[in-house]
Amino acid sequence: MKNLKIVHTSDTHLGTDWKPELEKKAFRAILNGAIDLDADVVLIVGDVFDHARVADEVLQFFVQQIRTANIPVVVLPGNHDLYGEHSVYHREPFNDAPPNLYILSDNDGEIISFPELGLDVWGRAMLSHTPQFQPILGMPVKTADNWLVALAHGHYHFENDTEVRSSPIYPDEVANATCDYLALGHWERQVDVSNGRVKAFYSGSPLGALQTNENVSVIMAELNATTGVTAQQCWLPI
């Protein structure tokens, strides 16, 4: 298997009413940083957009930034940008989406393969944010020759968390997952929820819960055929 570098982010919330220009600068910094880090692919794990009513200008900005970056970008819809009949991803600006943009759009889960990288990316697009939606249900078995990276947008239940939550992810599900790396979204802060042999991380919002104006935070995951999978928080200048 090839050695890969993956930039993992989530919860960019483009189109928010709070500091919209800062959100754009942060998004641009993520893509520029991925290029500088020589990443092979960028993962955006849900809540790319703040809501389904964002202006077309915001969607056009997103599409243009992906096109300019010219690096594979995989998007998983989350609870703020659900993938259904009226999804933001069906709107006109996406009719001109660049070939390096990949959207996981199957509510039952799908694989997007990158043969040149030896990489399979899997995820379930969220149709509704309810306790019945299980973000990593149906994850496939990996093939011998490819890395399998899974994307999931939902709430991880620590052992003492017994409340009923929407889009739940449980420790035993992570421990028994078939993927090499589980890229998570939904939480604003970066959290390591690895379990067993599976590396699993929330990237957190790029601007963080405290909304800094100077840097963005992402996860840099490295998949190495000899040493295995590592992941660490990485700060990029805005």
Roles of regions detected by a PLM:
Residues M1-V63, P135:
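N-terminal active-site segment of His-dependent metallophosphoesterases
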Residues K2, L117, T227-V229:
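Residue-level signal for beta-strand positions within conserved beta-sheet cores that form or flank
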Residues V7, D120-W122, I219:
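Conserved beta-strand elements of the Class I
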Residues A34-D38, A69, K142-D145, M220, ...:
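Glycine-rich phosphate-binding loop signature in dinucleotide/nucleotide-binding domains
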Residues V42, L182, A231-C234:
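Generic beta-strand hydrophobic packing signal
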Residues V45, F61-Q64, D192, M220-N224:
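A general secondary-structure boundary signal
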Residues A52-L210, N215:
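His/Asp/Glu-rich metal-coordinating catalytic cores
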Residues L210-I238:
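C-terminal functional module detector
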